[in-house]
Regions:
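Terminal, non-catalytic domain-edge segments
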Residues: 4-121
Length: 121
């Protein structure tokens, strides 16, 4: 979810009910979890497969070294000016923090009055 959130912040098109402060706080927490320790990097300094540390069993057959750098897309907001609300808004609890603390939170979903089905056969 980091890459789409970062892109939406960069495009200044965050969904209603999702603030810049929430997105920045969530992205920052994930980045700290991933990058504060050195267990996500091999002896050559390259990223390894895993959320936290080396977890090669989570790889799919199509995973390759380039796949490991998709998290870098979460840095897209670095292209926003320092005065942008993404940087200047106060940090706020994000959806999972609200959910697990018992606070009210908006459901993340798409609603459509039109029901579409698709035959698979």
């Amino acid at each position: 979810a980091m890459q789409p959130l970062a892109l939406m912040a960069w495009y200044e098109q965050l969904p209603a009910g999702l603030s810049n402060g929430q997105v920045r706080a969530a992205l920052t927490a994930v980045m700290h979890r991933m990058f504060d320790g050195q267990e996500n990097f091999n002896e050559g300094g390259f990223l390894t497969i895993g959320f936290v540390g080396r977890q090669p069993n989570i790889a799919d057959w199509y995973t390759n070294n380039g796949s490991l750098y998709l998290p870098s897309l979460a840095f897209l907001p670095l292209g926003l000016p320092a005065t942008h609300p993404f940087w200047s808004d106060a940090p706020q609890p994000w959806t999972s923090q609200k959910a697990w603390s018992g606070a009210p939170f908006p459901k993340d979903h798409h609603w459509s009055d039109e029901i579409r089905t698709r035959d698979l056969f």
